[in-house]
């Protein structure tokens, strides 16, 4: 009987489930074919080694891809499609679920939306009194290391949606999720502004590269 290591990714998935696949095998499953003189498993391994991680791979631009021998526009488009499908899946799920099921679901959604962004994006999730999702919006965009946030605009949008609570989030393209002094100050400003309209700020999450910081989990909110 074949061992799992000897099975092709597709057969291994059918036998043991998608979670049994390594990063290399999962990438090979999506790529489907290799290049002349190179099978798909070898190609997948070389691609991951070149970019260092799945994050590095899925956030790379076409110019970076052209540095990998045998990779063209078709496979670049496939991989960008994977990242976009994941982002849209979580976006649709957030819109269709009747409520936020768990902090994990919220974090997964925010990571899918913000992890690969090359500049800072400030996103707000608006919730009703039962903490059902009303809307999520990218309200502000900035530079590589800064985003200008206007608390009154957050409150204005919350009032328009009749929201009772909000969850704040933004990314750090540098990869480090630790909040800066400016991050803490803007959180305090948003909280104070929301309090005037009886709107609760439930959390502020900072999304880094494979890591996150939750103000609520740290007891700051």
Curated annotation (Swiss-Prot):
Zn(2+) binds at residues 170, 172, 183. Residues 99-221 form the MPN domain. The keyword Electron transport does not apply. Keywords: Hydrolase, Metal-binding, Metalloprotease, Protease, Zinc. It comes from the Bacteria. One of its GO terms (molecular function) is metal ion binding. GO terms for biological process: proteolysis. A motif (JAMM motif) lies at residues 170-183. PROSITE patterns: MPN, UPF0758. Belongs to the UPF0758 family. YicR subfamily. This is UPF0758 protein YicR. It comes from Salmonella newport (strain SL254).
């Amino acid at each position: 009987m074949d061992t799992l290591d000897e099975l092709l990714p597709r057969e291994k998935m059918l036998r043991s489930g998608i979670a049994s696949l390594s990063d290399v095998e999962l990438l090979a499953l999506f790529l489907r074919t290799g290049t002349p003189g190179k099978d798909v498993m070898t190609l997948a391994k070389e691609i991951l080694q070149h970019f260092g991680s799945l994050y590095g791979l899925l956030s790379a631009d076409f110019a970076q891809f052209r540095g990998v021998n045998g990779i063209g526009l078709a496979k670049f488009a496939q991989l960008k499609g994977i990242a976009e499908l994941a982002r849209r899946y979580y976006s649709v799920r957030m819109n269709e679920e009747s409520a936020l099921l768990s902090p994990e679901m919220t974090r997964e959604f925010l990571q899918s939306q913000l992890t690969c962004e090359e500049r800072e994006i400030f996103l707000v999730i608006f919730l009703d009194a039962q903490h059902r999702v009303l809307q999520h919006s990218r309200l502000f965009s900035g530079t590589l290391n800064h985003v200008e946030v206007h608390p009154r605009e957050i409150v204005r949008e919350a009032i328009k949606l009749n929201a009772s609570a909000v969850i704040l989030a933004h990314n750090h393209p540098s990869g480090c999720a630790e909040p800066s002094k400016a991050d803490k100050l803007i959180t305090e400003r948003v909280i104070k502004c929301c309090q005037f309209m009886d709107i609760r700020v439930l959390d502020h999450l900072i999304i880094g590269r494979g890591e996150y910081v939750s103000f609520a989990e740290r007891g700051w909110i």
